[in-house]
A protein has these predicted regions:
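Alpha-helical transmembrane segments of multi-pass secondary-active solute transporters
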Residues: 77-78, 108, 213, 253-258, ...
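Transmembrane alpha-helix termini and helix-breaking/packing motifs in multi-pass membrane transporters
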Residues: 63-70, 124-140, 222-261, 362, ...
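A helix-boundary/kink motif common to multi-pass secondary transporters
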Residues: 71-74, 101-108, 240-241, 249-251, ...
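C-terminal ends and interior cores of transmembrane alpha-helices
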Residues: 114-149, 406-424
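Helix-loop boundary and gating motifs at the non-cytosolic
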Residues: 23-90, 328-378
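Substrate-agnostic recognition of the 12-TM MFS/MFS-like secondary transporter fold
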Residues: 43-60, 81-119, 151-239, 258-272, ...
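Juxtamembrane intracellular "pre-TM" segments in multi-pass secondary transporters
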Residues: 12-41, 275-344, 362, 532-534
Length: 534
C-alpha cells in the first residue's frame, strides 16, 4: 500500500445509479480515518507524558539517592552515573537505531518500554537496599563502601545506563518514524477529502501536522522537566521520617514512589502504544516481509557524493560499524543541521544548570533569586514552542532554524560578555537576561531541526540516523562531564562558559554554511516527497 494514495478510494462498481451511495461511503470512511488519527495522536501525547514524567522524576531522584549515600559530601557518584549513562548512549545509540530500522514497529516499542521501565524498577529496589542502613551507622561520617555497597552502586549505574539507552531508542522510534508515518496519513486523508488536491497542498498538510505534533511533544517535554522535579521534591519532603540525616533513611520511601511511577508508566505506555499501532494500519507496513522488500528496493543507494550504499548503509566490510554509521549519517542532505543541534549540548554552563547555579552562589547571588529566575528560564523555553508555531506558519523551516540559532548566539554573547563585568548587579542582569531569552532560540531551533530531519531522512535509515544523532548529543554531554572532573573550582566557570559559547557559535556557523552553500537540497522535489513516505 502506498501511503501517498488516498485512504479511501472505492469505485462505483454498481453503476452510476449508486454513485451517491459510494460517495457517502467514501465520506464516512474519511471521517472515520480522521477520527482514528486524532485519537491516535492524543494517545501519543498521553504515552509521551508518562514516559517523560517518569524519566525526569527518576533522573532527579537518582542523583539525590547517590548523593545521600555519600552524606551529601561528594558529587563523585552523581558524576560517575552521568558519565556511564551518557557514554552508553554515545557508544550504542547507532546500534539501537539499526535495530529499529530492521524490526517490526510495535515489537520494538513494546521491547523498549518493557525493558526500560523494568530496569528503572530494579534500580529503585537497589537504591532502597543501598539506603537501608542499621541506625547505629548514623554515627559514621562517611559512606560505607563495603562489597555489598559497591555491587549495588555498580548495578544502579548499569541499570541506569540500560534505561537511558532504551529510552533514547524509544524516542527515536516514535519521533523519527511513527510521527512521520502518521503525518503522511494526515496528508492522505486531506487528499481523500478533495481528489483535486495538488501535491504542494499535500506537502503543506503533512508539514502543518508535523509542526503541530512536534510543538505539543516539546511542550510536554518542557512541562515534565519543570513539574517532575518540583512534584518529586514536594513528595520527598512529605516522606521525610526524620530518622537520620545520614545515608538517606528519609529517601527510602522515595525509591518506592519512583518505582510506583515507573510501574504506572509501563502500563500506560504499553497500552497507548498498542492502541496507536492498531488505530493506524500504515504503521504495520514495517512487517518483516516488507522490511525485506524495502531492502531489495534500496540495495544500491547513492549519496550526494556519489558513493554507493547497500541497504542504506555504506558498503564496507573492514570499517568499524560506528564509522559506517557516521558515514551514512553525514551522507544525508540534512546532516549538518543535526550536527549543529548536537553542538548545543555543550551549552551546560549558560543554561541555569547545576554548574551555573554553583557559580551564581559563589558570586553572592541569593538562592531565592536563583530559584525564581530558573523558573522564568524554563517558562521562556515553553514560550519558545509557541514562537516556533507562529514562525513556522510564516516562514520556511530552514529560515526558522537560521533565525533561531542566530538569536540564541546573540543572547549567549551577552551572557559571555557579562562574565567580564565587575559590577555584580550589571553582571546578574546581563547573564540572566541572556540565558532566559536564549531558551526561546534553543527550543525553536530544536523543533525546526527535528522536523527537517523528519521530512528529509529516507525510511530505510530513519532509525540509524536518529540513533547516531542521539550518540552525538550524548558525546558532547560526556565531554562536559569529563571537564567537570578536572575543573571543579567555581573560578573555572569562565572556561565552561567559553566552551558553551564556542559550541553555540559553531552550531550557528555549521548551520549557516549548510543553508547558504546547499540551499538547493531544500527545494521541494519529487524525490523529497517520496522520501517522506514509508
Amino acid at each position: 500500500m502506498d501511503e501517498r494514495e488516498p485512504l479511501v478510494s472505492q469505485s462505483t462498481k454498481e453503476g452510476s445509479s449508486d454513485s451517491s451511495k459510494s460517495e457517502s461511503i467514501d465520506d464516512d470512511g474519511v471521517v472515520l480515518a480522521e477520527e482514528k488519527l486524532d485519537h491516535a495522536r492524543w494517545l501519543l501525547y498521553i504515552s509521551h507524558m508518562f514516559n517523560q514524567f517518569s524519566e525526569q522524576a527518576w533522573q532527579f531522584c537518582v542523583a539525590l539517592f547517590l548523593a545521600a549515600f555519600t552524606n551529601n559530601q561528594s558529587l563523585i557518584l552523581v558524576t560517575s552515573y552521568g558519565l556511564v549513562t551518557y557514554s552508553t548512549v554515545c557508544f550504542f545509540g547507532s546500534s539501537i537505531g539499526r535495530y529499529i530500522d530492521k524490526s517490526n514497529r510495535l515489537a520494538v516499542a513494546r521491547l523498549f518500554i518493557g525493558l526500560e521501565n523494568l530496569a528503572v524498577l530494579t534500580a529503585t529496589v537497589m537504591c532502597y537496599i543501598l539506603l537501608s542502613r542499621d541506625k547505629d551507622t548514623t554515627m559514621i561520617s562517611g559512606p560505607l563502601y563495603d562489597t555489598k555497597s559497591v555491587l549495588l552502586l555498580v548495578s544502579i549505574h548499569l541499570l541506569g545506563a540500560v534505561a537511558m539507552i532504551l529510552d533514547s531508542g524509544f524516542l527515536v522510534a516514535v519521533e523519527r518514524d511513527w510521527i512521520v508515518v502518521m503525518s503522511v496519513v494526515a496528508s492522505n486523508i486531506h487528499k481523500s477529502k478533495d481528489s483535486s488536491t495538488k501535491e504542494e497542498e499535500e506537502d503543506n498538510t503533512q508539514k502543518e501536522w508535523l509542526s503541530d505534533t512536534n510543538v505539543k511533544m516539546r511542550q510536554i517535554d518542557l512541562s515534565c522537566k519543570i513539574l517532575a522535579p518540583a512534584i518529586s521534591g514536594i513528595l520527598l519532603a512529605s516522606l521525610d521520617d526524620g530518622t537520620s540525616e545520614n545515608h538517606g533513611y528519609n529517601l527510602r520511601g522515595a525509591t518506592l514512589m519512583i518505582g510506583g511511577v515507573n510501574a504506572t508508566a509501563l502500563i500506560v505506555e504499553y497500552i497507548c502504544t498498542a492502541k496507536i499501532y492498531h488505530e493506524i494500519p500504515e504503521l504495520a507496513m514495517k512487517s518483516f516481509g516488507e522490511i525485506a522488500e524495502d531492502k531489495k528496493k534500496s540495495e544500491i543507494k547513492l549519496d550526494n557524493n556519489g558513493r554507493e550504499h547497500k541497504n542504506g548503509h555504506t558498503e564496507s566490510t573492514s570499517k568499524p560499524k560506528i564509522l559506517v554509521d557516521l558515514e551514512v549519517y553525514f551522507s544525508q542532505s540534512i546532516c549538518w543541521a543535526g550536527f549543529s543541534l548536537s553542538l548545543l549540548y555543550l551549552n551546560v554552563a549558560l543554561s541555569f544548570g547545576n554548574i551555573m547555579t554553583v557559580y551564581l552562589v559563589w558570586r553572592g547571588i541569593g538562592l531565592e533569586a536563583i530559584g525564581l529566575w530558573r523558573g522564568v528560564s524554563s517558562a521562556m523555553g515553553l514560550a519558545g514552542t509557541f514562537v516556533y508555531h507562529i514562525l513556522a506558519q510564516k516562514l520556511g523551516l530552514v529560515d526558522v532554524g537560521m533565525i533561531s540559532v542566530t538569536f540564541e548566539f546573540l543572547c549567549l554573547a551577552i551572557c559571555f560578555g557579562s562574565l567580564f563585568v565587575n559590577d555584580n548587579d550589571v553582571f546578574f542582569i546581563m547573564l540572566i537576561a541572556g540565558v532566559c531569552f536564549s531558551r526561546i532560540g534553543l527550543w525553536v531551533f530544536d523543533i525546526s531541526v527535528t522536523q527537517l530531519m523528519q521530512l528529509h531522512i529516507p525510511p530505510p535509515v530513519r532509525g540509524l540516523v536518529g540513533g547516531v544523532q542521539s550518540s552525538m548529543n550524548a558525546f558532547f554531554t560526556v565531554m562536559i562531564y569529563v571537564a567537570g572532573l578536572f575543573l571543579s573550582d567555581p573560578e573555572n566557570f569562565k572556561i565552561f562558559a567559553s566552551i558553551s559559547f564556542a559550541g553555540v557559535t559553531s552550531a550557528a556557523i555549521f548551520y549557516g554554511i549548510m543553508v547558504f552553500a546547499r540551499r538547493r537540497i531544500f527545494m521541494p522535489t519529487k524525490d523529497d516527497n517520496n522520501a517522506s513516505s514509508v
